[in-house]
A protein has these predicted regions:
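PRPP-associated nucleotide enzymes
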Residues: 1-190
Length: 190
C-alpha cells in the first residue's frame, strides 16, 4: 500500500504550513528581539523536528537549538497521560536563556504543561511554548500554548513530522489518516 492510499484527506497543505510557519516566526522574532537573553528553541523529538527546522530558518534573531525526547503515547493513538522524559536537556545553566519549547501538536496539554514545570524547576528563567497544531477539544489540563499555528478538529493527523507508529512523518502536508489504518472502523472514528 502506498502512503497516498492511507490518507483520507489533506487538512493543511504545504503552502499553508509555510504561511503558518512564517507568521509564527515573525511573532517570535518581534517578541524576543529586545531580550537580553539568548533564545533557545527546544525541539521536542521526534515529532517537532521538521517544524523546528523550518521555523528556525525564518526567525531573524540569533538563537540556539536544543532537543529533548519526551513520550506520552507509547504504541497507542491516545496519550497515556504519563509523561516520560527519555532524553533530557543537556544544558546546565538555564537562567541566562529564554526557552521556547517547540511542539508539533498539543492534545491533552499534559506534555507541555509538565515539560514547562520541569524546565522551571531546573532553573529556567523563562519558558514559553509554540505548537504548530492545537486540539483544544482534547485538553485534560488547563494549558494554552503561547504561540499556536492552527487550531484543528479532533482528527488523527499525520505528516510534516507527525506520525502513526513511526510512519508518515515524511509527508510534506498534514493529512487525516484513514481510520482503518490505525485500527478503527469508520463508526468508531466518529
Amino acid at each position: 500500500m502506498e502512503i497516498k492510499d492511507c490518507i483520507e484527506s489533506i487538512l493543511i497543505s504545504e503552502e499553508e504550513i509555510d504561511s503558518i510557519t512564517s507568521s509564527l516566526a515573525e511573532k517570535i522574532t518581534e517578541d524576543y528581539k529586545n531580550s537580553e537573553k539568548e533564545l533557545v528553541l527546544l525541539c521536542v523529538l521526534k515529532g517537532s523536528i521538521v517544524f523546528t527546522s523550518d521555523l528556525m530558518k525564518k526567525i531573524s534573531i540569533p538563537l540556539e537549538v536544543e532537543t529533548m525526547k519526551v513520550s506520552s503515547y507509547g504504541g497507542s493513538t491516545v496519550s497515556s497521560g504519563v509523561i516520560k522524559i527519555q532524553l533530557d536537556l543537556c544544558r546546565d545553566d538555564l537562567s541566562k536563556v529564554d526557552i521556547l519549547i517547540i511542539e508539533d501538536i498539543v492534545d491533552s496539554g499534559n506534555t507541555l504543561a509538565k515539560l514547562t514545570k520541569h524546565l522551571l524547576k531546573k532553573g529556567a528563567s523563562s519558558v514559553k511554548t509554540c505548537t504548530l497544531l492545537d486540539k483544544p477539544s482534547r485538553r485534560v489540563v488547563d494549558f494554552v500554548p503561547d504561540y499556536c499555528g492552527k487550531v484543528i478538529p479532533d482528527e488523527f493527523v499525520v505528516g510534516y513530522g507527525l506520525d502513526y507508529d513511526e510512519k508518515f512523518r515524511n509527508l510534506p502536508f498534514i493529512g487525516i489518516l484513514k481510520p482503518e489504518v490505525y485500527g478503527k472502523t469508520s463508526a468508531e472514528a466518529n
